[in-house]
Amino acid sequence: NTNGIVDFAEESVTHTEDQTTFSTETDAMANDFNSVVDNFTSLSGREANTLATPCDATVTVDSNSSPRKITITYNGSTCNPLRTRTGSVVITLPTTVRWRDSGAVMTVSFQNVKITRTADNKSITINGLQTIKNVSGGLVRTVAAQIPGNNNVVVHEIRSSNMSITFNDSSNRTWQIARRRTFTNNTGLVITTRGMATVDGVNNVAEWGTNRFGHDFITATTEPMVVRQSCNFRLTSGQVTHSKLSSIVTVTFGLDSAGVATTCPANAPFYLKMVYTGANGITRTVIRPY
């Protein structure tokens, strides 16, 4: 970093890590929301729920308010060896809406949700609103349990125009989200995520905005991002491109430390591989854990 000009290698690596953390962690929280809301809207509240209440959170439900309100408070527990979470999320659902119905929309308010990576203590803090639309109808719980006569596929769309992200260097930026998540079952839940926006001529865009260096970016999914319950709901494969930076950065997920596709590493990290062209025209590759 010379005379205030950010080294592109530094920006490529740091932005990739920021976007990966934001994307994987907000999707993980969306799984929490599914778990809680699916259970809340079931007739007895006691049906088997494969997506259990988060191990690092408490849940309160106000079914008498209008709209109905669910608060998830993350308590900083180390039950997940890879990260800790604090802060709260408030989910609202109109009293006239059943979440299982096609077209139902829940509104999610992130309130100082801080996610800290255990390996290096780096954190992001998220505030803002997003909506989750149940496009297909049905409940993720029934896909997980493979209950006969119910939807075998559930599709959700997540959108936001104002997710505020504070990075560990105290810089604050606003990002936008447009993701489509498809839930199927193959030895447990499989969650396949694709971007669904078109921004500046780029298709399949999942996130866009300004990175911590103050530069615009667009992140598109070039291969679907796949999360598997059989691997503890971790991102097991996928590829994105970051554009509008000094060079297009291609990031591939689900790899080992040598950059080769691998099976689930249990409590050890997966690795991602970044490929970009530096200012001197030389293609560079960086491999990092996630």
Question: Could you say what each language-model-derived stretch is?
Answer:
Residues 1-290:
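Low-complexity, intrinsically disordered segments exposed to solvent
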